[in-house]
Design a protein with these regions (language model features):
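Short helix-capping/linker segments at secondary-structure and domain boundaries
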Residues: 99-104, 175-178, 248-255, 278-282
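Flexible, polar/acidic helix-loop-strand segments at domain edges
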Residues: 239
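Internal maturation/activation junctions in enzymes
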Residues: 142, 250-297
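Noncatalytic scaffold domains of N-terminal-nucleophile
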Residues: 2-6, 10-183, 188-232, 236, ...
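Protein kinase glycine-rich loop
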Residues: 243
């Protein structure tokens, strides 16, 4: 809201919000992750879709899904360890979005979060819940120091959390630009984190510095009298949303009251069918021919 009050664009506000989420919801969102962004320019009647999803390191091969004996690793096992981490695209995407649609100066977007990280923010209830899991901070000394007390118990909800390292990182990016996050040595810490322990990553500094943000054609389809546009693959959420909406449109006589068993049943079945399709047909279009338009036709 502060960005809009200062004359900024919706993109300025979105970037400032993302930076703040990296502080107060760091378990779910941050500079080490990936982002999709869709932007509608009402004046130009133009829709832009940017893909900043985390991607596999350049050295990745299919053999990384197998164990030392050649057997297929369990799906749950592949989701743990440094090998499961993708090359982050959030910051490159934010920089590209700002270059295209931002109005305020880049450093201005960082001020609220730098201030909150330096002065402290109250421990959110959801972060507390996540950190309370038995293995949440195991072997992570930095997390223990930041979010836990001397008895290694999660600090109570509402406790003031100060994160000077995040503030320092944001100050560097604000003053020197997005590439500063890797130029100032953060890449060393990031790579050390994903290259140690269980199933280490093959990620390199070159992967981090050469991340390619892609502009993709949005995926659009009809819903009643509307035209709904969503993020195209590799995002699978858009395909699911359009499929569900179009199946519901065929049953529009049922209304939209979730308290009615008939509608609730149709909605649940539509979701099941859409999820089945996305699991079977939707993947990274760089490696797999995705029949996206056919799926929402």
């Amino acid at each position: 809201l502060k960005m809009l009050q200062q004359g900024g664009s919706a993109i300025d506000a979105a970037i400032a919000a993302q930076l703040m989420l990296g502080l107060v919801e760091s378990q779910s969102s941050g500079l080490g992750g990936g982002t999709f962004l869709m932007h509608w320019d009402a004046a130009q009647k133009s829709l832009t879709s940017l893909d900043g999803l985390a991607i596999s390191p350049q050295k990745t091969t299919a053999s990384l899904t197998t164990d030392v004996d050649g057997s297929q690793l369990p799906y749950a096992s592949m989701g743990r360890g440094g090998r499961s981490a993708g090359v982050p695209g959030t910051l490159p995407l934010l920089a590209k979005a700002h270059a295209k649609f931002g109005k305020l100066a880049w450093p201005a977007l960082f001020v609220p979060t730098i201030e909150a990280a330096s002065k402290g923010f109250p421990m959110p209830a959801y972060m507390h819940q996540i950190l309370s899991a038995p293995t949440a901070a195991k072997d992570h000394a930095d997390m223990l120091a930041l979010y836990f007390d001397d008895a290694q118990k999660v600090k109570p909800v509402g406790t003031l959390i100060v994160n000077p390292d995040y503030a320092k990182t944001l100050q560097s990016i604000a003053l020197k630009g997005p590439s500063a996050i890797w130029a100032d040595g953060a890449s060393t810490d990031f790579l050390a984190a994903v290259q140690k322990g269980y199933k280490p990553s093959l990620m390199t500094e070159e992967d981090l510095k050469s991340y390619p943000v892609e502009e993709r054609e949005p995926l659009c389809g009809p819903y009643l009298r509307y035209r709904v546009c969503v993020m195209a693959p590799p995002s699978f959420g858009g395909v699911v949303v359009l499929q569900v909406l179009q199946m519901l449109a065929e049953k529009s006589n049922l209304g939209t009251d979730f308290n009615q068993p008939e509608f609730a049943h149709v909605f649940a079945e539509a979701g099941k069918l859409a999820q089945a399709d996305r699991r079977r047909y939707v993947a990274d279009p760089a490696f797999f021919k995705v029949p996206a338009k056919a799926l929402v036709n």
